[in-house]
């Protein structure tokens, strides 16, 4: 750092001058002047003693103005923690001002002036002060403690060749004189700085701690926001999944209903010649692209007449499923005696139960042929089967199966044939027509009539039917047919001989008069009320025909009929009218089956599935 060619006489002259002046301590300007004198390489070659003295005087005069700038340079150098602050200040000042003369070639005749040197010193001092302030303001302790040492260690290592002379000079100066007050103050400041730890100040540490806390809080908030967004997305996905499942179920249900409706339209028997022709828009499902996801089969496009022959049967439950209103009991009390069977359900009750009655027009379209020459009634109900949805009301007698039986009467060679061909898909009425003719001149006695009734009872008991007792067969005779006619005006004739077993609506000839061979055929014509006897209407030609018919349509028609045809006179008619009492049937029921005695029992009987057996 220092020039090795500097003669020792110059150093000695300064020291001796200082010693001869009576212990005068050199000031900072004097030190700078000596440094400038030492850094001049051409001092021994081209300058004379006078020029050197003049230069020294000019330096001394001008260095006073630079002392203020040189002093902080010394102070800044002491912040770096070197063991010898004064020698290092001289080192640093010399290094800052001796760069250009040493870098310049030795043959140059021009030397830097004192003003240039002072300006350079001031600039370097300002730079160092700014750098020191920046380093102190940083929060990183490692950078603040290592960077100054690295910089100044590089400078010191670059000038290791001149360190020995500087140490000798500093040692001679310390041995000769003590430092002045300024040097003592600067050394005190340096010692205080050295006593402080190399880490951060408390304020910096507090600031750094608060910054870390803020960073932690910000990071926590960021993580919480991300977690909240993730949870919201998860919840939204769950809601969408649930909605997707619900919508799929709704689409599946609607598609199933649509297919059912399309099938219903296809199965409908259209009256037009071309049949039922559905448009292509109805045949193609709106949810065609979702059928694969919904696991539904695609709807096959069939012909317009493909479903005409499809008939859907709908089973009818028992009468216990029908709900009657609050006034039903009173209405039944007015129509029927206690313990008797129920009337037919009304149209409202049918609609409430979800079933439809067959239209009267369809009933009239079904032809029936009646042969007047014989006693055979042929029921043709299979001519035009209806392709529409049918609701055949079947009474609670599902187990009743049998065939049409021919019951021989007590007269000569006369058969009471009852042919019933009922179909559950076509009609809910079985035409049970009973006609009885008397070709003999002998009179019919009540004993013969009662024997015929007993024969019918025995046939019912012996047949495969749920009516296993005579009492059940007797009640079966009073049950209406499957059309449920209103039996309000049906009468039960009391036996004039006191026979309680006569529970049929039969008319007995008691005057022994000769009967005619006139056969009065009563055609049902889909009306089950024709086989009941109404005394409020006029009689035709003195001939009265009564019949009791029971029909059950469960695929196989079963019919039982007993008829008596006798002429009457006015006295007998009056006797018959006066003899029809509503309490006779109740009295007979009390005698034979005493469990049906009041309205509550009849209601319980109705709720029990209307099964009489």
Curated annotation (Swiss-Prot):
* Polar residues: compositionally biased ranges: 138-147, 369-389
For this UniProt entry, what's an example GO CC term?
nucleus
Q: Does the keyword Nucleus apply?
A: yes
Q: In which tissues is it expressed?
A: Moderate expression in some regions of the larval nervous system, the ring gland and imaginal disks. High expression in larval gut, excretory malpighian tubules, salivary glands, and, to a lesser extent, the fat body where levels are approximately 2.5-fold less than the gut.
CDD domains, sorted: bZIP_ATF3
Q: How does it assemble?
A: Interacts with Jra/jun; the interaction enhances the DNA-binding activity of Atf3.
Protein name in the entry: Activating transcription factor 3
SMART domains, alphabetized = BRLZ
Q: Which family does it belong to?
A: Belongs to the bZIP family. ATF subfamily.
A GO term, aspect molecular function:
RNA polymerase II cis-regulatory region sequence-specific DNA binding
